[in-house]
């Protein structure tokens, strides 16, 4: 059945926000930050963001991406994905880990968000 592919209207709106706000550099490294107020506006939680993690990857130019989801406690859960280049090394450097093309990490400041995005961009330049 097609039910498997369906998402709630709220998640669809969040996906729209992701596409609207997605920042993509010249080498196809992308990121978006989902603040608590955005999640609250759509009445969603961190768990609901799992459904939209793959969204940036549907864009041709995007090769790797991170979605930074602000938690109620203030830090950010980082959902990282890549089409080719392994990213789990970066995840390990930032309180996380996972598979080569699908990893998770945590960022405890705006600076760490920048650091993670910079490390991802460096991966592509190599």
Regions inferred by a protein language model and the residue ranges of each:
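Hydrophobic helix-and-loop "lid/oligomerization" segment in the mid-to-C-terminal part
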Residues: 1-126
